[in-house]
Amino acid sequence: MGLNEQQNVPSQRKIIVFIVLAFIPIALFRLCFNNPFSSIKDTSLQDSAANVVITSFSSSSQEEESQESFDHIQDEPLCDYTQGNWVRDEIGPLYNGSTCGTIKDGQNCFRHGRPDSGYLYWKWKPNECDIPRFDSNRFLDLMRDKHLAFIGDSMARNQLESLLCLLSTVSSPDLVYRNGEDNKFRRWRFESHNVTVSVYWSPFLVAGLEKSGNLDHNVLHIDRVDERWGNDLERFDTVVVSVGHWFLHPAVYYESGSVLGCHSCETSNCTEVGFYDVFRKAIRTTLRAVAGSGREVILTTFSPSHFEGRPWDSLGACNMTKPYEGKVLEGLDLDMRKIEIEEYTAAAAEVRLEVLDVTAMSVLRPDGHPGPYMYADPFKNGVPERIPNDCLHWCLPGPVDTWNEIMIEMLRRWKV
């Protein structure tokens, strides 16, 4: 190689470097604004979202879902939360008998001296998903500027008071209305979010008279709803319905103004018809009444008691301290739930309706009732031979808090 050729090599190298450097900005520009991988990435994400099967509940503390995912969530079935087990939860409840001021006296097991606390440290674990802890801020956001009404018997009140305790951890409710014996009609306001929460005592949902000193049986008109809540129906955005146990009492039934029959009517001159069909018709009448106007309806299924065949005043009734591990639904509990599920299925096409199916999970919690601690310090004067027990309602805090953890998921899906 001659001297001139050797001198030309650096020049050629400079030209090549210059050309390469000139093309780098152009390549970068094309990658940024015409990236051939961008469409592949977007398509992959969209396909993934389209094929997602919802297997877990979500909460505001989890990663925010995209709008595309939200749109699809509406069409996907929820994980079956009705099948599962109670597992230990070391975190415990969000409130206690001292921090919540709206607990009915008979359900404040802590203040009434219940000595064990293990019943507080369980959570419901569905077989195929997880239920997030109750998010009070999320609930209030979902119900902003809305009116939520609980309608039914003392189990509806039990669930309501659980909800108030959960919400009061972030915002104090103001009692703005109360009426009736034992404050059976009450209304609260959460000014922070303009949320109204009400409870209406209506143990049959339909019109009727409750037994009293002058009446030894209930009277039900099963073809029209109870006006005590029916007259306020247009004020409600969301309704939670919960009844059942009052239908077991003696009653005379009317339909279209005529006597239909009765249940346990030893002194009445009418036909014994039982209560199952009447319970069904009462649920049906109610769901027809609340249909329309975009109103959201949640039907809470039958909540089992745990007297286990023992008298209500027997010593040791519902004195369990742990959940059952394998008890199955049967008898009354199974039949009442079956009726509610069937009526829910029939009405779902006409009503914006969800069923809060708590029967199976609740039958596993004999430890969650007040028992003798429905009254304060029941053994302060020793152990009596007979003592009143509440094996129906739930201690607060207690298993009923789980019902509201599931309910918030229903509200979230409605708001998507």
From Swiss-Prot:
Query: Which intervals lie on the Cytoplasmic side per UniProt?
Result: 1-14
Variant or mutagenesis effect after changing residue 126 to S: In axy4-1; reduced xyloglucan O-acetylation. Almost abolishes xyloglucan acetyltransferase activity
The residues that carry sugar chains are 96, 194, 269, 319
Annotated Gene Ontology cellular component terms: Golgi apparatus; Golgi membrane
This protein's UniProt keywords:
Disulfide bond, Glycoprotein, Golgi apparatus, Membrane, Signal-anchor, Transferase, Transmembrane, Transmembrane helix
Question: What result is annotated for mutating residue 368 to K?
Answer: Abolishes xyloglucan acetyltransferase activity
Q: Which InterPro entries match?
A: TBL, TBL_C, TBL_N
User: Which residue ranges does UniProt annotate as crossing the membrane?
Assistant: 15-35
Q: What is its EC number?
A: 2.3.1.-
Q: What happens when the gene is disrupted?
A: No visible phenotype. Loss of O-acetylated xyloglucan oligosaccharides in roots and rosette leaves, but no effect on xyloglucan O-acetylation in seeds.
Molecular function (Gene Ontology), one example: O-acetyltransferase activity
Compartments annotated for it: namely:
Golgi apparatus membrane
Q: Which sequence ranges are listed under topological domain Lumenal?
A: 36-416
- Which residues are the active-site ones? 154 (nucleophile), 390 (proton donor), 393 (proton acceptor)
| One biological process term in Gene Ontology | xyloglucan metabolic process
Q: Which cysteines are joined by disulfide bonds?
A: 79-129, 100-165, 109-395, 318-391
Bilayer topology: Single-pass type II membrane protein
Give residue numbers for sequence motif GDS motif.
Answer: 152-154
Q: Where is this motif: DXXH motif?
A: 390-393
Q: Which family does it belong to?
A: Belongs to the PC-esterase family. TBL subfamily.
Anything else known:
Contains 2 motifs that are conserved in esterases, but it is unlikely that this protein belongs to the catalytically active pectin esterases. A naturally occurring ecotype (cv. Ty-0) lacks AXY4-mediated xyloglucan O-acetylation due to 2 amino acid changes, Asp367Glu and Gly368Lys.
Which PANTHER family does the entry mention?
PROTEIN TRICHOME BIREFRINGENCE-LIKE 9-RELATED, XYLOGLUCAN O-ACETYLTRANSFERASE 1
Q: What biological function has been recorded for the protein in this entry?
A: Xyloglucan acetyltransferase that catalyzes the acetylation of fucosylated Gal residues on xyloglucan side chains. Predominantly catalyze 6-O-monoacetylation of Gal residues in the Fuc-Gal-Xyl trisaccharide side chains of xyloglucan oligomers. Involved in xyloglucan specific O-acetylation in roots and rosette leaves.
- Protein name as it appears in the record: Xyloglucan O-acetyltransferase 1
Species per Swiss-Prot/TrEMBL record: Arabidopsis thaliana
Which gene carries the instructions for this protein? AXY4
